[in-house]
Design a protein with these regions (language model features):
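A short, conserved alpha-helix in the catalytic core of glycosyltransferases
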Residues: 156-160, 219-239, 244-272
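Short aromatic/hydrophobic "clamp" motif used to bind/position activated sugar donors
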Residues: 142
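Acidic donor-binding segment of Leloir-type glycosyltransferases
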Residues: 75-119
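Conserved donor NDP-sugar-binding/catalytic core segment of glycosyltransferases
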Residues: 153-193
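A recurrent flexible, glycine/aromatic-enriched loop bordering the glycosyltransferase active site
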Residues: 127-128, 193-230
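Conserved small/polar residues in nucleotide/adenosyl-binding loops
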Residues: 385-392
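Non-catalytic membrane-proximal stalk/linker segments that position and tether the catalytic domains
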Residues: 1-52, 293-298, 306-367
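Glycine-rich, basic loop-to-helix element that forms the pyrophosphate-binding segment
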Residues: 120-137
Length: 392
């Protein structure tokens, strides 16, 4: 029946005498807020994984012990790091090594990292294997990684990703050391008259070389495919690796092509990894392999004649005959220090490289002779707009 005024007043008084009711209501609201916050955080993590996932593509064959070191170092990163998926491309390991690789893949998968093992027997072709991995990748970025790379620092990938996401950046590389040392293996590729080389290779990283070349992030003509990060859309826009370059210079050719498309290639120098160089395919020093190397280098320059002996990121006043970066004055060489701009040279018919970026310079480096010596340097302004803007 209907409640009378007395009963209503009594219930109201009982509620007022129960102070825990207010706290219970507040606790339920707080619990709901926590649940909503957790759900929102999970949705944000899923979105982050979808938007920024890096697909790590690793070509490998008959190398499970070294591969294991690579995979474990890759997955030992702190919580909250850029998420990865791994695509392992095997072009024909023997049965014993295939089983070892499958066990390794299961270990990595059980530990929580998505990994896919693609076993497709074929002759070794680095470009084909990388392109195959890129076809299967779901990530917004692609990291091409040799199976003999050992990662050493927690935030190396996050740092590389932050650079690769910049709209004008093509590929991003990492400083590489020889195992258990600070001896440089890769610090960006330089294109010299003898061909593409790793400047500062075999040199100790215990000092700063020319203007901090081994200390700061640098633009370069290309980075090594042993550890190369690139946005998926840019890689596909470029058309992937050229499969006619089966072993060597495929990474350099990609770097040349990215420059021609208007992108920069960058080497990140404040993080490093170890490179147990070429353990998968062996040495390149046999006569047959040296012949192949020469042939692929010539093919590279047939594809990009304007780059033969030219590197827009390497000063002409530095050594162009070896791996060090010492200054070589113009009077000791036959070079012309007043050559026309790089993008106007080398193309048939005299056409310019229209898409190469011609940004204003950020720094003017001027070296002068001291009173005790004459070095014979020439100062060439390369960006009059920038220099005039700072005259005052």
């Amino acid at each position: 029946g209907l409640q009378g005024p007395a009963e209503t007043s009594r219930e109201k008084a009982e509620d007022e005498q129960n102070p825990w009711e207010e706290y219970r209501t507040a606790a339920e609201s707080a619990k709901l807020s926590v649940e909503l916050a957790a759900k929102a955080a999970e949705e944000a993590r899923e979105l982050f994984a979808r938007e920024l996932r890096v697909s790590v593509i690793i070509p490998s064959k008959d190398n499970p012990s070294v591969l294991g070191k690579c995979l474990r170092s890759l997955t030992q990163r702190p919580e909250g790091s850029v998420p990865v998926e791994i695509l392992l491309i095997d072009n024909g390991s023997n049965e014993e090594n295939r089983k070892k690789t499958e066990q390794l893949v299961e270990e990595i998968r059980t530990a929580g990292t998505p990994i896919r093992y693609v076993y497709e027997p074929a002759e070794f072709n680095f470009s084909t294997m990388c392109n195959r991995g890129a076809e299967l990748a779901d990530g917004k970025l692609l990291l091409f990684l040799n199976d003999d790379i050992e990662l050493c620092e927690n935030d190396w990938l996050d740092k590389m990703v932050s650079r690769a996401l910049q709209p004008y950046v093509g590929s991003v590389g990492l400083k590489l050391y020889y195992p258990d040392s600070v001896k440089i293996q890769h610090d960006g590729i330089v294109n010299l008259p003898v061909g593409p080389v790793h400047k500062l290779q075999f040199m100790e990283d215990d000092r700063s070389y020319y203007f901090g070349r081994n200390r700061f992030t640098q633009d370069c003509v290309a980075v090594t495919g042993a550890c190369l990060l690139i946005r998926t859309e840019v890689f596909r826009e470029a058309g992937g690796f050229r499969e006619v370059l089966r072993v060597a210079y495929n990474d350099v050719e990609l770097g040349f092509r990215l420059l021609e498309m208007g992108y920069y290639n960058v080497v990140w120098n404040d993080r490093f990894a170890y490179h147990h160089e070429s353990l998968s395919r062996g040495s390149d020093e046999s006569p047959e392999k040296m012949q192949r190397l020469v042939q692929e280098r010539e093919l590279l320059y047939q594809m990009h004649p304007q780059f033969r002996g030219e590197d827009p990121f390497y000063p002409k006043g530095l050594n162009r005959e070896g791996l060090d970066s010492r200054v070589v004055p113009a009077y000791l060489t036959d070079r012309n220090v007043l050559q026309e701009p790089f993008w106007k040279r080398g193309l048939p018919g005299g056409e310019e490289l229209q898409k190469i970026r011609r940004d204003n310079c950020l720094m003017a480096r001027v070296e002068t002779a001291g009173p005790e010596r004459i070095q014979g340097y020439s100062v060439i302004p390369v960006s009059y707009t920038h220099l005039r803007a700072h005259e005052t």
